[in-house]
């Protein structure tokens, strides 16, 4: 249920109440997942974005454990997994449909506040709510990996050389979406 998802999120983000309040206000826990990539098994049901993001966080944590990855902050895999796709909260919004007000649909926001973007837009949306480490910022910024626009590939490669976790973040996402 949405309440269970909110309770879980509140517990995980207890050190960042402003972030939890922002996500709660933006309907993160009930937002369906839009069909972003044609090959992605997306979840158009209530909570799809939450479940997808949590699965990325769990996959990144599993990679961390099995590959002995190190992070500047212990919570980084969770934060990166949960927050990398926050840009969706500016590009889409939930609308009730059907006989039940609990059924949700997804509409494209025709007048988002910020310009189009993925990781960069997520960072803009997050900057007033949590102080991310440089490592977390790079992982969120380049979470799309090779799907990052071509003109940014050289920066993506530099980010990987600076911190290998940038690559493993993209690996975790790919293992969830493909």
Give names to the regions the model predicted:
Residues 71-81, 120-178:
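Histidine/acidic-rich helix-loop-helix segments that form or flank divalent-metal centers
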Residues 1-103:
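Acidic/His-rich, divalent-metal-binding segments that scaffold phosphate/diphosphate chemistry
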Residues 98-110, 156:
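Metal-dependent catalytic cores of enzymes that make or break cyclic nucleotides
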């Amino acid at each position: 249920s949405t309440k269970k998802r909110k309770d879980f999120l509140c517990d995980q983000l207890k050190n960042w109440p402003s972030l939890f309040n922002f996500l709660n206000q933006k309907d993160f826990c009930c937002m369906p997942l839009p069909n972003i990539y044609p090959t992605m098994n997306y979840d158009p049901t209530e909570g799809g974005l939450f479940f997808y993001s949590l699965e990325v966080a769990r996959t990144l944590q599993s990679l961390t454990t099995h590959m002995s990855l190190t992070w500047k902050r212990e919570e980084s895999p969770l934060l990166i997994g949960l927050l990398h796709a926050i840009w969706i909260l500016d590009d889409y919004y939930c609308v009730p449909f059907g006989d039940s007000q609990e059924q949700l649909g997804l509409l494209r926001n025709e007048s988002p506040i910020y310009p189009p973007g993925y990781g960069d837009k997520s960072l803009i949306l997050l900057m007033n709510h949590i102080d991310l480490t440089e490592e977390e910022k790079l992982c969120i910024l380049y979470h799309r990996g090779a799907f990052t626009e071509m003109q940014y590939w050289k920066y993506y490669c530099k980010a990987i050389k600076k911190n290998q976790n940038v690559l493993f973040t993209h690996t975790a996402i790919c293992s969830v979406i493909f």
